């Protein structure tokens, strides 16, 4: 059994060079290293931007991971907030940077992995890999991970990991690959300590960090000390290497939802003069007939503020953009993270903050008070307070058809029987007003069917008073869908999309929680999942983009944007999926077809909306 290393084993840096490992934190608080290739790219960008902090140019503040690995195209690392942001779902993950000696496991490209339940191999966090490598090098065949805070032992002989409480075993393996990147520990002249790369220290002065300022964010301890936490925890423990994080180690929930407010520029460089950058926001809630499990709710709103007026003077500290987050929620994370990515891309420092719940001013004050830097659109909601009475199915059929005395010599495409014979649904559909031999054609398109077949088709749908021709898809009445309850929010930014450089950007955020299927869904009474929410979508803020936005609002009210069905990507059943109205979920890199530039997108989505019965005529009726 391996014992905790003694103080004599503490390693000391004798070189300004070290190996950098970047890791991200999952929802359970476990850290996962990026691959050596991705880490090399991140470190290169980080060092470059860190060098620019000393006056070598403007900063992007964000690192697009897709440039290093195409499979990571949706992900961006936002350096000021030390956050990995997924553009298509809005998911935010904490990231950190570790420095190891060059002779460590990461420096030699050694990675230890364990076999997960789905049959894939998952890498241990870098400090665990290094510890395992050290113990095996000393001849310890059975390594106890308790010094790192884990309730496991790893048997090098059998290549297994054993839970000391449940005795459950997993396979482990040792992989050798490319070494992680070697970096230089940057410190300005006169600085004797290891430079802290946290954004608070980097912004503290224009001459670099000072030795006494690293203690709040950098751990430099004897190798892998016995933790003071319970042995079952999943938080990380650091060794002789330095663990860089933006703040003191927060709680598990706080690390993801409540970053502290930083009041200075993350990199110490003054942003360009933006004048008054307006940020517009509106929200549209859909509260249709939806059954939610106890305790479920939709997310609240997020407010943002932008500084106005001239930029800061060279000797002053520029103001930041605080993102107000009254309650930690996924939509708020998405909005705050998206704002951080957008604003940092133009050089404006953005920091997430946890704000107290604001008190609502009187309505008269809300109506009269306005700000030059923030403009809010009227908040709209749809609350089905008084549902319309359900029309009689037979009457709906009669409203859109004309009965034919002599049926044409053709088949009914619904039941595949001759129109001159009885309806194939006569044995399962009972109606006193429509006979089994009755035939009619739809008034607009003139396609003919058994009227009883049309009745069966209508009763099998939403029964919302509308019909859609099964032959040509012509819509009669106002078509509605089966979209679950959720929320639609809209923001506007003064940044352009590729191919639309002459205008700003419209950001749409859809939020739908998990729930219970209603009578209009495939399996009424059973739960449904809502993966990847909130989802972010982008439109150019020009005349055509604004028209598409207004039509999407109509489609949202009619419950046409999403539905409950089977995912075409994962095969999961009873889950929320898109409903034939395509959205752009990425701002750029149109490799997958979900981003920009795409010169035909707006015309295509207008055609898809029209196929659902949502046209400009709907806007005139509002």
Curated annotation (Swiss-Prot):
- Write out the pathway annotation from the protein's UniProt entry: Protein modification; protein ubiquitination
Gene Ontology CC terms: cytoplasm; nuclear membrane; nucleoplasm
- The species is Homo sapiens
**Compositionally biased tracts (Basic residues):** 372-381
Any one GO molecular function term: zinc ion binding
Q: Residue spans with biased composition (Low complexity)?
A: 299-322
Q: What is this protein called?
A: Probable E3 ubiquitin-protein ligase DTX2
Keyword Zinc-finger present in the record's keywords: the answer is yes
What information about domains appears in the record's comments? The WWE domains are thought to mediate some protein-protein interaction, and are frequently found in ubiquitin ligases.
């Amino acid at each position: 059994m391996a014992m905790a290393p003694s103080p004599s084993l503490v390693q000391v840096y004798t070189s300004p060079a070290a190996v950098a490992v970047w890791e991200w934190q999952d929802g359970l608080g476990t850290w996962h290293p990026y691959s050596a290739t991705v880490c090399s790219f991140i470190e290169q960008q980080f060092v470059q931007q860190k060098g620019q902090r000393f006056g070598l140019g403007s900063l992007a503040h964000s690192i697009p991971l897709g440039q290093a690995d195409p499979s990571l195209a949706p992900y961006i690392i936002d350096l000021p907030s030390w956050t990995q942001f997924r553009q298509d779902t809005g998911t935010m993950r904490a990231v950190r940077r570790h420095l190891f000696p060059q002779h460590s496991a990461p420096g030699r490209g050694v990675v230890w992995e364990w076999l997960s339940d789905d049959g894939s191999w998952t890498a241990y966090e870098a400090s665990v890999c290094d510890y395992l490598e050290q113990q095996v090098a000393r001849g310890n065949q059975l390594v106890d991970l308790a010094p790192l805070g884990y309730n496991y032992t790893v048997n090098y002989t059998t290549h297994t990991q054993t839970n000391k409480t449940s005795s459950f075993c997993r396979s482990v393996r040792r992989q050798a690959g490319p070494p992680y990147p070697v970096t230089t520990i940057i410190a300005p002249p006169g600085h004797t300590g290891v430079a802290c790369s946290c954004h608070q220290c980097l912004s503290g002065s224009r001459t670099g960090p000072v030795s006494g300022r690293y203690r709040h964010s950098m751990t430099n301890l004897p190798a892998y000390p016995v933790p003071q936490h319970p042995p079952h925890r999943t938080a990380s423990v650091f060794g002789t290497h330095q663990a860089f994080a933006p703040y003191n180690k927060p709680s598990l929930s706080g690390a993801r939802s409540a970053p502290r407010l930083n009041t200075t520029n993350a990199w110490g460089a003054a942003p360009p003069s933006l004048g008054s950058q307006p940020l517009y926001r509106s929200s549209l809630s859909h509260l249709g007939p939806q059954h939610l499990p106890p305790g479920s709710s939709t997310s609240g709103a997020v407010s943002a503020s932008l500084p106005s007026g001239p930029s800061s003077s060279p000797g002053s500290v520029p103001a930041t953009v605080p993102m107000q987050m009254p309650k930690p929620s996924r939509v708020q994370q998405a909005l705050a993270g998206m704002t951080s990515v957008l604003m940092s891309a133009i050089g404006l420092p953005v920091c997430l903050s946890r704000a107290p719940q604001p008190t609502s001013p009187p309505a008269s004050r809300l109506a009269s008070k306005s700000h030059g830097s923030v403009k809010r659109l009227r908040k709209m909601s749809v609350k089905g307070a008084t549902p319309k009475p359900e029309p009689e199915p037979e009457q709906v059929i009669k409203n859109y058809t004309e009965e034919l005395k002599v049926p044409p010599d053709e088949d009914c495409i619904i039941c595949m029987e001759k129109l001159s014979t009885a309806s194939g649904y006569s044995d399962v559909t009972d109606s006193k007003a429509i006979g089994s031999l009755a035939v009619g054609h739809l008034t607009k398109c003139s396609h003919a069917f058994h009227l009883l077949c049309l009745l069966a088709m209508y009763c099998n749908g939403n029964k919302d008073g509308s019909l859609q021709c099964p032959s040509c898809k012509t819509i009669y009445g106002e078509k509605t869908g089966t979209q679950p309850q959720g929320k639609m929010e809209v923001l506007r930014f003064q940044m352009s999309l590729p191919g639309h450089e002459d205008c700003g950007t419209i950001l749409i955020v859809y939020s739908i929680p998990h729930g219970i299927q209603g009578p209009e869904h495939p399996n009424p009474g059973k739960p449904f999942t809502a993966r990847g929410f909130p989802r972010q979508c982008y439109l150019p803020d020009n005349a055509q983009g604004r028209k598409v936005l207004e039509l999407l609002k109509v489609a949202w009210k009619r419950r046409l944007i999403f539905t409950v069905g089977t995912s075409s990507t994962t095969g999961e059943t009873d889950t929320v999926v898109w409903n034939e109205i395509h959205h752009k979920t990425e701002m750029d890199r149109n490799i997958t077809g979900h981003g920009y530039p795409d010169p035909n997108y707006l015309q295509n989505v207008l055609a898809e909306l029209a196929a659902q019965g949502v046209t400009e005529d709907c806007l005139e009726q509002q």
